[in-house]
């Protein structure tokens, strides 16, 4: 296995080193080929490394900085003034080829702004997109993009998102010709605004993307398609609504299983199965949103992620780096554009 180096914004998120450092140690235990550069306040980081095994410490490097991008920083302000922040330095490690990927649980807007400026977009990509997984009844992940990086998108941008999402699914899940759909207000060809209509026409003119047509909101979790494309306004609302519904269902299930002696007895008997179902509904199980379309790999973790959830984001970054995702997207876009122009 080829050695990989990840850069972690150790100070990002609600919990900082309390979560990021233990998660990094667990990642090193899982992947013997992995090296991790922790960027942040060395004094705070060292607290969580005191009990670490020597063989793990040998694969950790610390780059000290006491500057942090706060959750309240506006993206433009962070880009202009937080030039020595843990987030920016972690991204610069990817830009300078010292790391193959970066993971941060910090300010999403600042992360996207810094990544776009420092890493630049791939040839043929107008805007990067934020993409993550949703659960489905088929037990396989469904990729949804964009999740908020671009509030409004033209048809060409939606087309590019479809290509990037398809390649991501192929790379991470090793799925041949994943099914791609555009999220719309109806499945009929006449439905939707001009941007969605024109994006559909572009996708219908290439055989390299397995475009299946429109999909409505009630089919998002069906598993009938692998990649769902929309603008960032719709995608972000869809994601946050999904997380809210998942929390509601978990709450209602737990409350229902504690009412009455007989129900509590049955709950104990089927506890392992209940736990498995709750795990599948837990948003942390799908933690890690990829900012794709850049010349480097950037993965965004939930700000409130715990150690296990943050480890999931690290694992996603490892997989994307192993598959060389940016190169795959670049090659596929070039091939499709050449095909269309001919």
From Swiss-Prot:
One of its GO terms (cellular component) is cytoplasm. GO terms for molecular function: phosphate:acyl-[acyl carrier protein] acyltransferase activity. The keyword Cytoplasm applies. Pathway: Lipid metabolism; phospholipid metabolism. Its main location: cytoplasm. One of its GO terms (biological process) is phospholipid biosynthetic process. The keyword Lipid metabolism applies. Belongs to the PlsX family. Homodimer. Probably interacts with PlsY. This is Phosphate acyltransferase. It comes from Shewanella baltica (strain OS155 / ATCC BAA-1091). The lineage of its organism: Bacteria, Pseudomonadati, Pseudomonadota, Gammaproteobacteria, Alteromonadales.
């Amino acid at each position: 296995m080829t050695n990989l180096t990840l850069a972690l914004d150790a100070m990002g998120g609600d919990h900082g080193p309390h979560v990021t450092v233990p998660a990094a140690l667990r990642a090193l235990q899982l992947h013997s080929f992995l090296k991790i550069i922790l960027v942040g306040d060395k004094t705070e980081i060292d607290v969580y490394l005191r009990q670490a095994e020597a063989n793990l410490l040998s694969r950790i490097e610390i780059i000290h900085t006491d500057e942090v991008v706060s959750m309240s920083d506006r993206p433009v302000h962070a880009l202009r003034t937080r030039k020595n922040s843990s987030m920016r330095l972690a991204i610069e490690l990817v830009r300078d080829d010292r790391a193959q990927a970066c993971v941060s649980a910090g300010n999403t807007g600042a992360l996207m702004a810094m990544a776009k400026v420092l890493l630049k977009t791939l040839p043929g990509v107008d805007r990067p997109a934020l993409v993550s997984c949703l659960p489905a009844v088929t037990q396989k992940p469904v990729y949804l993009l964009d999740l908020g990086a671009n509030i409004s998108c033209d048809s060409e941008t939606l087309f590019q998102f479809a290509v990037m999402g398809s390649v991501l699914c192929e790379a991470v899940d090793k799925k041949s010709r994943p099914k791609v759909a555009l999220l719309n207000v109806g499945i009929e060809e006449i439905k939707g605004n001009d941007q969605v209509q024109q994006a559909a026409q572009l996708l219908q003119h290439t055989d390299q993307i397995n475009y299946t047509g429109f999909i409505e909101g009630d089919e998002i979790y069906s598993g009938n398609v692998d990649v769902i494309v929309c603008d960032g306004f719709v995608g972000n609302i869809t994601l946050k609504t999904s997380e809210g519904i998942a929390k509601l269902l978990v709450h209602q299930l737990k409350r229902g299983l504690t009412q009455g002696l007989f129900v509590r007895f049955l709950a104990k008997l089927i506890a392992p199965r209940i736990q498995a179902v709750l795990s599948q509904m837990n948003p942390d199980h799908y933690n890690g949103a990829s900012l794709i379309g850049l010349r480097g790999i950037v993965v965004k973790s939930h700000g409130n992620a715990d150690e296990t959830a943050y480890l999931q984001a690290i694992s996603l970054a490892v997989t994307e780096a192993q598959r060389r995702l940016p190169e795959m997207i670049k090659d596929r876009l070039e091939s499709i554009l050449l095909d269309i122009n001919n």
